[in-house]
């Protein structure tokens, strides 16, 4: 018997050592790739621009948070406590918040332009900076319009600004060799051409065809299966990391998809009935893989609170409250997360971890799936409990969060020590 127990402990130790070595290799490879990416001019300019835009973004994020929790008609606290607040000009307030989101993107484009052209040793940056600032306005806003879609299109803004900067660099270098005034007619022609492209793209991105198609796709029964949920857990962090805006169903409460509605109808008809879709985006992905936003980044805010660098501690405190309510934009700009391989790997790992544990707990009947509707801004860490009234879900949530902290910790430790792009 003692030999059997000893042999078992030896096998466990071998497995543990194997996974430990594999983890170290993955972290080292990811860190090397991250350092390679941080040598790219466009990435350097983008990361610096995001960090410099962070104060304005913080104002925007907290204003939206107050609106979502208290001011809007379907705000979380208004719904939970049945408050009857009469707030004048609610619609105008929402419009102002939408405009503020676009203004953040405009500042991001202008700051990126100045940073990138400085790296390119271009001295006359006023016109291209102003052009990309106005171009972003024309890209997202039409005459008398406010955006009714997700404006978190960071990749689009950075790419268009990058192309504009490169065209200005070569235009100035090879066409305008006599170094005319910054607002010479030949440069104004270039600016007009860039703005014309932005206006043309505006009519393409405001079309709802793509967004409607994605919403319809996510309502497909495929995303109630194990493979479908795993696919979402990998693709969603990847797209968010790339700076591509995600459908509402992947960043907020997807209680309007067909599977959730059918489950709710079944429960309301007969509380003891078998659910047609016990595993779906709402009961698995949102409830267990979205803590703090895409990639379960609430763990990052928690880790940063204990960082040895004051700057990172401040970022952790600044981002903690929005992260509790599923908003990780401050982390996205503050670290930044954009195009950083070092942060993509743990984002996918934690997202997959939450999906695997949540899915397993539901199919083994360890917990009840979330079927009851919750307000849109409900913290994802509470959806499993509030949507099922099953206290065991809180235990699963705690386990997933603790494991997420363990996964993120070595990556954040390396990120904290990497300041090459800041230099």
Predicted regions and their residues:
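Central hydrophobic cores of alpha-helical transmembrane segments
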Residues: 125-135, 243, 254-256, 321, ...
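Juxtamembrane non-transmembrane "cap" segments at the membrane-aqueous interface
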Residues: 254-266, 353-377
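Acidic, Ala/Val/Gly-enriched low-complexity intrinsically disordered segments
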Residues: 2, 12-15
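Juxtamembrane inter-helical linkers in multi-pass membrane proteins
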Residues: 23-32, 257-273, 312-332, 375
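Signature of multi-pass transmembrane helix bundles
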Residues: 15-69, 75-245, 369, 375-423
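Generic multipass alpha-helical transmembrane bundles of integral membrane proteins
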Residues: 192-307, 316
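Hydrophobic alpha-helical bundle architecture
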Residues: 119, 283-286, 300-368, 385-395
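Short terminal hydrophobic/aromatic SLiMs and anchors at protein ends
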Residues: 5-6
């Amino acid at each position: 018997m003692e030999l059997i127990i000893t042999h078992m402990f030896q096998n466990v130790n071998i497995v543990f050592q194997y996974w430990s070595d594999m983890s170290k290799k993955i972290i080292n490879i990811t860190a090397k790739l991250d350092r390679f990416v941080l040598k790219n001019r466009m990435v350097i300019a983008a990361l610096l621009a995001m960090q410099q835009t962070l104060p304005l973004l913080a104002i925007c994020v907290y204003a939206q948070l107050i609106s979502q929790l208290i001011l809007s008609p379907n705000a979380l606290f208004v719904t939970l406590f049945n408050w009857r607040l009469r707030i004048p000009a609610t619609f105008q307030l929402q419009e102002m918040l939408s405009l503020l989101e676009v203004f953040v993107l405009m500042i991001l484009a202008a700051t990126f332009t100045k940073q990138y052209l400085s790296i390119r040793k271009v001295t006359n940056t006023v016109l291209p900076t102003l052009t990309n600032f106005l171009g972003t306005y024309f890209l997202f806003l039409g005459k008398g319009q406010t955006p009714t879609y997700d404006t978190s299109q960071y990749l689009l803004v950075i790419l268009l600004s990058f192309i504009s900067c490169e065209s200005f660099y070569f235009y100035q270098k090879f066409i305008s060799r006599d170094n005319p005034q910054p607002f010479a007619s030949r440069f104004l022609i270039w600016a007009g051409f860039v703005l014309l492209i932005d206006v043309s793209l505006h009519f393409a991105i405001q079309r709802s065809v793509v967004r409607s198609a994605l919403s319809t796709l996510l309502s497909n029964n495929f995303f109630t299966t194990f493979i479908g949920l795993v696919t979402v857990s990998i693709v969603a962090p990847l797209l968010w990391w790339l700076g591509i805006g995600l459908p509402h169903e992947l960043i907020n409460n997807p209680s309007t998809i067909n599977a959730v509605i059918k489950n709710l109808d079944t429960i309301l008809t007969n509380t003891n009935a078998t659910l047609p879709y016990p595993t779906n985006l709402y009961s698995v992905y949102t409830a267990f893989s979205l803590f703090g936003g895409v990639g379960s980044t609430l763990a990052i805010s928690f880790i940063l609170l204990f960082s040895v660098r004051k700057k990172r501690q401040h970022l952790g405190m600044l981002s903690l409250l929005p992260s509790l309510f599923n908003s990780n934009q401050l982390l996205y700009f503050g670290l930044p997360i954009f195009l950083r391989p070092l942060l993509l790997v743990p984002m996918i790992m934690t997202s997959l971890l939450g999906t695997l544990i949540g899915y397993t707990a539901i199919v083994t009947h360890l917990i009840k799936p979330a079927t009851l509707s919750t307000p849109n801004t409900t913290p994802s860490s509470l959806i499993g409990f509030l949507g099922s009234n099953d206290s065991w879900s809180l235990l699963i949530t705690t386990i997933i969060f603790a494991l997420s902290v363990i996964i993120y910790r070595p990556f954040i430790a390396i990120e904290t020590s990497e300041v090459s792009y800041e230099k």
